[in-house]
């Protein structure tokens, strides 16, 4: 049975072929969208549709026997319900004047709309947590870089200040030494002048002796 035959089979119950076609399209569209989003669609007495992730693996090419790597992928999967299995196996007989699939319990169709499965929710939360951790790490790296730059600037400034102070001290020491040398140089000629004056006293002494000698001769 294909889609057109399915529509023909339910057209009488839905009031016409167009209404049946619209109903089939609406059911299939809702089913496909839910499975693609990661939801599990369960129909009581019929089965469930769900999305299954297959990890990367190796397979054999049936024609050449060559080993081929198969990438990670997701596939839809249908699991038949127990009621459906019992009808197919023959353990239960199909009802003649009733619906083959067990009807949904009263009140089950008026509940809240289906939500995303827990697995999908966990994946989304994990992605958000990873993004937040990356942002935090980036901020920490920026802070460390800024701290390193600030420390380098302070160290360089301190080194420059120390160098300036040391240079100033050396300059002051040189100035003091030069002043001391100049003072010593100025004081030295005074000593020489004193030394020069000393012979004058000797000359006076000689003159006095000469005068005394002349007096004696007389």
UniProtKB/Swiss-Prot annotation:
GO terms for biological process: chromosome condensation. This is DNA-binding protein HU 2. Residues 1-91 are annotated as: Bacterial histone-like domain. Histone-like DNA-binding protein which is capable of wrapping DNA to stabilize it, and thus to prevent its denaturation under extreme environmental conditions. It is found in: Cytoplasm, Nucleoid. Residues 127-161, 173-182 have a biased composition (Low complexity). GO terms for molecular function: DNA binding; structural constituent of chromatin. PROSITE patterns: HISTONE_LIKE. The lineage of its organism: Bacteria, Bacillati, Actinomycetota, Actinomycetes, Kitasatosporales. The gene is hup2. Gene3D superfamilies: IHF-like DNA-binding proteins.
